[in-house]
Each structure stands twice: as C-alpha cells, then as structure tokens.
Amino acid sequence: MKKGIIGKKIGMTQIFTEDGTRVPVTVIQAGPCVVTQKKTASIDGYSAVQVGFDSTPAANASKPMLGHCTKSGQGVFRYLREFKFDAASEMNLGDVLTVEQFTAGDFVDVTGTSIGKGFQGVIKRYNFRGGRASHGSRFHRAPGSIGASATPSRVFKNKKMPGQLGNTQVTMQCLQVIRVDADDNLLLIKGAIPGHRNNIVLIKNSVKA
C-alpha cells in the first residue's frame, strides 16, 4: 500500500542503537495532514488525493483558498500537495493522515528543495578541475572552450556552464525510517535530506524498496 505525508525538516541529530552504534538522523515533523480534495480518473484523468499541512488563520488565506479548504471542515492550510494513493477512492474529505502509517524499518523517498547557492561557476557547480595555479597561467577558474566557431557554430544544449546552483527539487531515495514518534508527530530518518531547516518535504514509501 502506498503511503505519503507532508512534513517539515526540523534538523539533524544522532541516536545510538542498543549495541552502541551511532546513527545520524534527520528529524521531520510529519503531519498531521488533512484530505482537502479527491481526484478521480473519471473527472480529473487520474486518481489522487490532495492533502493540507500546517494550519493557518483564515484571515491569511485568499478567498479561493478559503473556499477550497473549508470543504474539508478542518480549517485552512498553508501547504497543499498531492499523493497518488492506491486507496484514494476509500478516503473522504476531512480524513487525517498521521505519521503512524510508517513504522521503523520502512524505506522512504523524501522530496524537498535543495539549499540555493546563487550564481556559481563551473568549478563549484560541476566540480571542474580548473587551470594551473602556477606563475604565468592565464587560466584558473574559467570553463574553457564551449564550442567551435565554424562547425557547429553554436553551443550545444545542456552544456555545463556557470549558472544557478541549488534551489531545485531533489529526491533522496531509499532512506530508512529509524524511529516513529506518534505523540509528537516526528519521523527520524537515517541520513540527510534536501533543504534547510523548516523546509517542506514530501515523504512517500520508496519506489525501489
């Protein structure tokens, strides 16, 4: 059965297993999330559920968002995301998704927005080797030639060049759930996940596990 929930990255810490092994983990505040919309194959072309996370005052929401969220009867939410569940047809508006759907030992995929680094050169962006640092060298951190002048007289698509680094959607696959704290809605996942603290992430069961 497919699982999914919206969460917020709290930070990283470390825990110790019974045999004394130190395990680095990322702490995620996962849910609770509320089903705000059901999508069906007959109407929308696919089956999915839209869930809301992080309640916000109604005064902060636009009128379209206010009207959309009030259908669930659970208030207004700051973040809305979709999940394609096998049991989407069995869910109803207002149903609550909690962290209890996961158990320790599960493998999940975590999708988030990576930390933005701004405009960077090819050495930082693509790990280019760079030029010599010795006396007389005129080539240090430049990318070098990007194409010939006669043929093909253009720069090929996807040429590695300076540009924006980070601030893109990244998915980390097959991360193991170490601990589930249902009382505080916390997930402890082994290793690092994309983004800075308070970054919104999507947690789904792994497609490769």
UniProtKB/Swiss-Prot annotation:
GO terms for cellular component: cytosolic large ribosomal subunit. Gene3D superfamilies: 3.30.160.810, Translation factors. GO terms for molecular function: rRNA binding; structural constituent of ribosome. PROSITE patterns: RIBOSOMAL_L3. Keywords: Ribonucleoprotein, Ribosomal protein, RNA-binding, rRNA-binding. InterPro entries: Ribosomal_uL3, Ribosomal_uL3_bac/org-type, Ribosomal_uL3_CS, Transl_B-barrel_sf. The keyword Iron does not apply. GO terms for biological process: translation. Transmembrane segments: none annotated. The keyword Ribosomal protein applies. Pfam families: Ribosomal_L3 (PF00297). One of the primary rRNA binding proteins, it binds directly near the 3'-end of the 23S rRNA, where it nucleates assembly of the 50S subunit. Part of the 50S ribosomal subunit. Forms a cluster with proteins L14 and L19. Belongs to the universal ribosomal protein uL3 family. This is Large ribosomal subunit protein uL3. It comes from Pelobacter propionicus (strain DSM 2379 / NBRC 103807 / OttBd1). The gene is rplC.
